[in-house]
Amino acid sequence: VSLNVAPGDAVSEGKVLLIMDSMKMEHEVAAEASGIVQHIDVAPGDTVFEDSPLMLIEEADVDADSVDIGQEVDLDHIRPDLAEVEARRAKGYDENRPEAVARRDKTNQRTARQNVEDLVDEGTFIEYGPMVIAARRRRTPLDELIDRTPADGLIGGIGEVNGSLFPEEDARCMVMSYDYTVLAGTQGKKNHQKKDRLFRIAETWRLPVVFFAEGGGGRPGDTDVEFAANLHTPAFNLWGKLSGNAPMVGIVSGRCFAGNAVILGCCDTVIATANSTIGMGGPA
């Protein structure tokens, strides 16, 4: 990919001499000893085979002042593209959604993230698909979708529960929660796909699943779909297959209808607050 030295250059042990591309990954080749570059046997764009020489370096004591140590790197610097990703993720956090949090406070209910964070041990939750948005780009501007449909209304991932009492492997759980502040916690195309993936992981790893199921069921307003019906959605089949695989716990506060109620009803244990309304049909 690139050469960082030329014949006659003094190099110190550990200096990156060249960068090679293999299997779509870039690999640094560093000097194993200090010395002088005598000649180089490759050029950018060449195909390199196993055991082929790349360059010849004659070992020598090298004056530190004569060695180009390269550009100093600030290890605390965050690249602009990474900063953009972090800012994008942060849009879905409660502290950046004050209006949504206020709506939950008004009904004396908790947010989806509060429930997940309080259930899992601190620092153990690995969220899947936090930057997913609703499949509505044909009807809604992208910026609005990013602001109003974080995670497409489904927070899900793997975390540990009661890790202080059990070994790490035994404490590991799949934790999922519909987010009622996002389109009434309805089931959209992207959060269905997220569920499909997480259910398959739970089956493979035999993970207990805790699912906060508040929400209004199927969402009719998604536009970015390729099928006329939802017969291609395997989520409910995958969810049913988890029965007997590991414990399934459903929790609900508030309204839980249609597809959300199916998720809840298939659980081994259901925990519902007194203000819950659960049914296969009804208002979202």
Annotate each predicted stretch with a short phrase.
Residues 23-30, 58-68:
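Short, Lys/Arg- and Gly-enriched loop/turn segments at beta-strand edges
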Residues 176-202, 207, 268-270, 276-280, ...:
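Extended active-site and interfacial segments that coordinate phosphate-rich ligands
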Residues 8-22, 45-57:
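A structural signal for short beta-strand/turn segments enriched in small hydrophobics and glycine
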Residues 159-179, 194-221:
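A structural preference for short, pocket-lining loop segments at secondary-structure junctions
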Residues 213-284:
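Conserved catalytic cores of soluble enzyme domains
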Residues 65-173, 177-184:
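Intrinsically disordered, low-complexity segments enriched in small/flexible residues
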Residues 1-2, 16-34, 239-240:
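Short beta-strand-turn/beta-hairpin segments enriched in glycine/proline and small hydrophobics
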Residues 1-10, 39-43:
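Short histidine-centered loop motifs in beta-beta connectors
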